[in-house]
A protein has these predicted regions:
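Feature captures the catalytic cores and cofactor-binding loops of soluble hydro-lyases/lyases
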Residues: 1-143
Length: 143
């Protein structure tokens, strides 16, 4: 069965969580940078390995419009895996949003943007870019 994004527009996260008996819900530490934002769409998964953010750029290239980048950063909070530039590219490509169990940067710009971003935290430091991660694999992001 295929669902359209509009099928989910009026369904709350609490209703989904209840229907799924609390399974596959995000950890409470992952929060929207803009409280008015919500996101729905097919997940395009990204697995971060050894704090390498190069795989995020592969995901931006490969993800289909309407998809949500779900970045499994293993809970890392000492570096930011994306910021304002990545969000601008994701928005231009028509992605639905970004969710990460790690950190982003450029919090002021991201919180004022009309693009849904859900993060564990904010930190200005960037990681390495040597391409160790993977895309479109099973990931565990935020719980």
């Amino acid at each position: 069965m295929t669902f359209l994004k509009t099928d989910w527009d009026n369904v709350s996260s609490t209703s989904l969580s209840d229907a799924m008996h609390g399974l596959q819900t995000m950890d409470s530490c992952i929060q929207p940078l803009n409280r008015r934002m919500c996101v729905a769409g097919p997940a395009f998964t990204v697995q971060i390995v050894q704090n390498d953010c190069a795989v995020v750029f592969q995901a931006l290239r490969d993800a289909a419009p309407g998809s949500v980048l779900v970045i499994a950063a293993n809970g890392t909070t000492d570096v930011a895996f994306f910021g304002e530039i990545v969000v601008a590219i994701a928005k231009e490509k028509g992605l639905a949003g970004i969710v990460i169990d790690g950190c982003a940067r450029d919090s002021l710009a991201l919180s004022q943007n009309d693009f849904p971003v859900f993060v564990k935290g904010i930190v200005p430091r960037i990681p390495a870019r040597v391409f160790l991660g993977e895309v479109q694999k099973d990931v565990q992001c935020g719980g």
